[in-house]
Amino acid sequence: MTEYKCSTQPSSSNCRTKYRTYITAIKSKPFLILAGISGTGKSRIVRELARACWDVDSNEYETQKPRNFEMIQVKPNWHDSSELIGYVSRIGADQNGNGISFVVGDFLKFIAKAWEEPDVPYFLCLDEMNLAPVEQYFAEYLSVIESRKVDREGNVVTDPILKQNAQSWYWNLCTELTDDEKLRAQFRDKGISIPQNLIVVGTVNMDETTFSFSRKVLDRAMTIEMNDVDLYGGLTHRYEQIGKVSSEHLVGNAVEGVDVYESNKDVCDVVINYLQEINKKLEGTPFKVAYRTRNEFLLYIVIISRIIRMILARSYL
């Protein structure tokens, strides 16, 4: 297994302090929820982080929608994953099953695009994701995100979000999703899984028109509340002045506490002792800190401690 020792060394020194929280959270886990009052720029932040992955003089930086960004507006009538991933259609098929096809959802298309460009972070923004029950329309992703693990080559892999199938419709689907023959073969042999460079960010407004989140969803995501507003923000520059953000900033190569503990025992032990004290206070309740929360604490602290050391050395900002 590749040793993970706070490996957040950026490729540039221009990241702004304002975005450090978002970048660190994403690197800790590529599923982020931005919650707050309406109009605070939650979806804009996602778009600007995607834009910041490109050089300022490139076409992707100047365009309204960089190719590594996709926004999907959640609809209140979503109760399964057919709008996001897709569904098998039997329209036009005969009794023997000939002519069955797969209607591809935008999320699955974007997954394939991210696989084609593994060195570029790809951002999917689910806008107002709690307009519908997240546990229903996003069930496959919520399950698969928990299957993440580091393989022998040091890559983060997941179970397939769409399993391999021997039927002709699946073969045709793989052909439709990508022109890359190697990637087609991977999809056909192993199914379609979540690439390491795919970052999912949901924006949330809490009001009487939305659904509340279950613990299942909150446990699986990094959550940031956005209720502060700078009324001078965005008046002097068309785009956010983030600086160049590379894959090294955003794509993590650790998933569990075991991936970071041995190389960072000093800081990890401080975190564990703190969490143990919390659990003592929560004894006898169903709210004690468990392994998933512990792991995410460790990953976040290891990453942010590395950033702080670089700031003190003036090599990050």
Language model region names:
Residues 237-317:
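Alpha-helical lid/collar subdomain of P-loop NTPases
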Residues 1-251:
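AAA+ P-loop NTPase catalytic core and its hallmark functional loops
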